[in-house]
């Protein structure tokens, strides 16, 4: 995943309604009509949000007659997560002797150092 893709996903997830849509889809595939029942938005507004989520491949859709069903693209979320997991705290890159006794405050297993 490149920086442009990550930026696009962050922008897509920067909207409260789209985050709520993702949280509903965590439980499995949903019809657009089911999503509409949970929100106070119009069908065109839902379509707009779903297009943004689909364009960055966070959700996938399928048609069944006149109905559209959406589900999370788990592989895309895994790639997104791995991008952030690959970011290493600069303190972890230093040797223990170079840290002057400071532990990283952002990583598991390290104590939180307050300045």
Task: Go through each PLM region and give its residues.
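Alpha-helical residues within the helix-turn-helix
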Residues: 37, 48, 54-55
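Beta-hairpin "wing" of winged helix-turn-helix
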Residues: 55-64, 71
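C-terminal regulatory/oligomerization modules of transcriptional regulators
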Residues: 1-2, 24-30, 55, 74-115
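A generic alpha-helix structural signal
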Residues: 7-10, 50, 81
